[in-house]
Amino acid sequence: VIQERRRNMFSVNIDKIVVMTDNEKKCYEELRENLKKELNGGKVLAITKNGMGAFKIAYSFVCAGEKVLFIDADIMSEIFLGKYKLGKNLKGVADFLKKPSQMYDLICKTNNPQFDIIFTGVLDDGVISEDEESMMKQFIDMYSDKYDRLVLSSDVDGRIAKYCDGTVIMYEESEFGELSAENYVDEL
């Protein structure tokens, strides 16, 4: 459910997306606690290969009492824009990277006051340059003071992940192979 708010802001209901079995909840809680230890005080986390898993990890931090900003920074796909059927008019990460001098109101509120979202936005050509990519650090810095945790769904190439304090690679069980996972880590 999407509700239009003042000045073209949107509010989304995340309840259906974050529904998990008890076993899933337990797994995400354990993962969250391990990530906190591994990040060692860092607050910006990238997750590759699984946008919905990234969303659930972000929500797990919310369940632990943190204020979280989820950023759909996987410019090559619009999983969440498509899921919420928001169309192509919503500004997001891609818009900032293309025109960082313009001030956009990118935050999308959810029905949980501790959980906000920034969507991908519109990238007509599907490509960001190295200069635009380097703006991601500035983008992260703009929001890191306002939240306890930033969780980014990163592209599979890890171009965005390199600006984060840590990266999680989430494989589907059917595609996981130890050698391919090691090679992917080396590429990142």
Where are each of the predicted segments found?
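Conserved catalytic-core segment of NTP-binding enzymes
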Residues: 2-3, 64, 129-188
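P-loop/Walker-type NTP enzyme "switch/lid" segment
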Residues: 6, 10-40, 48-51, 66-145
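Short, Asp-centered acidic motifs that coordinate Mg2+ and/or phosphate
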Residues: 44, 115-117, 149, 166
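Aromatic pocket-lining residues of Rossmann-like dinucleotide-binding sites
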Residues: 61
